[in-house]
Amino acid sequence: QPKIERLMTPKRTKPGTKDTRKDWEKYRNIFLGAHRLNLGVQFWKDNETSLERAREIYHVDPAVIIGIIGVETRYGENTGNWKVLDSLVTLSFDYKRRADFFKKELEEFLVILYKNDLKPFDVQGSYAGAVGLPQFMPSSIKRFGVDFDGDGKIDINHSTADTIGSIANYLSKHGWVEG
């Protein structure tokens, strides 16, 4: 999948050409538009119990969790449409610069498939292999994923409770301090 490789390679501005990177003024409208803000308010209302529980356990402000989910997937509207297995295989073997990293992610992904009895080609995510509402890489699911809804499995694709708990756990384990 050469398209994946193109997406993973940063664009370089050629001398004498205009830099097309967006400044904050232009970029802000993408993340702070009315549609996304309305989705965020509704997501917060729908998941208030899990958000407050995450605050109590992990000491992470619900607004931070809400912000991450909003930026990553627009509250689940866009979790990616790439077959994660295809992406990780391609990046593991055809993207030499980071092949070792993606081979480890592929291994973790295969374990997740097996443990959760998932069909390999059904799981979709980003072109880099990130999945679910928080767009976690497979190794992050393994290390920081939480069964926050108590159903016996970690499901950041369909369980908003697991997503909230996993994000809070991730931040906590990375040194998040409330306040």
Regions found by a protein language model. Name each.
Residues Q1-Q124, G129, S139-G179:
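Cell-wall glycan-active module
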